């Protein structure tokens, strides 16, 4: 179950602590104007102690109290992006041409640059930086949030509907059944090459260009 897999596994809890500490440190710098995150200085200082142990390779599961484990699993802040009536999908792209390219390819694969509008992209980036919902770890050293576990909000659902209404000939009457967001450390392995089961699978990256050194 969640507790055993994520809170009592050394690699998993180390990943959670690292993300939790770095995220709360970022929020505390007030870059995105976040208020009322509901974490105490005592909690933050304990996270810092554990984080430093992880960084100098001296962390042990016994360093972590049962109370701290459960606190790390709690969602402290989850304010969704504001929703507007504007399409979140960038219609400056040649939609008809992109649809034809997808439908004519075998297998059906399509690469789109600048999928979102600049405003939608900015809102989604702020949400991913600040929403304290990334409580699930994976073997590649990354954390995730899921539609049924903190990610469901009006912005995400409108984004799904805007995709369908913009690319009508690709999505037709399909419904969104699952969505997730992953965060990766640049020094970890990340996700192996794979294909998820879906009629149409959409993957997009919102990392700022300046963070991409490739």
Tell me the role of every PLM-derived stretch.
Residues 1-214:
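Fe(II)/2-oxoglutarate oxygenase catalytic core
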